[in-house]
């Protein structure tokens, strides 16, 4: 799978929807400072180049984290403002890195902001 096969428009719409839901139902304030956690899984049937993916993430300032599943890659960045635009910037960038190395996004999250 490469960028041409991925639906970035749908992914961005889901990010905007999720941010709106978190704002409206959980009271997360726009522009709250968050540390964004991003999760990735290998693409079935493709060679997942984990070391290359982790190196790419690190070179862009993402901290590698503990993943819940052995095959999963977890990365964090922040603090960043809680806005759909800021989250999407990182989600799109890391998705492109992932797809080029045999991984796909598997969601994002963050710890509840202090304010």
Q: Model regions: which residues?
A:
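Long, contiguous binding/interaction regions
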Residues: 1-115
């Amino acid at each position: 799978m490469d960028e041409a096969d991925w639906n970035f428009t749908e992914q961005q719409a889901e990010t905007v929807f999720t941010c709106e839901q978190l704002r409206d139902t959980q009271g997360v304030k726009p522009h709250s400072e968050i540390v964004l956690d991003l999760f990735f899984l290998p693409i079935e049937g493709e060679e997942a180049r984990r070391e290359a993916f982790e190196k790419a993430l690190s070179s862009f300032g993402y901290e590698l984290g503990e993943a819940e599943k052995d095959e999963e890659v977890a990365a964090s960045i922040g603090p960043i403002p809680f806005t759909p635009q800021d989250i999407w910037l990182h989600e799109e960038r890391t998705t492109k890195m992932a797809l080029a190395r045999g991984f796909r996004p598997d969601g994002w999250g963050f710890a509840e902001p202090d304010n």
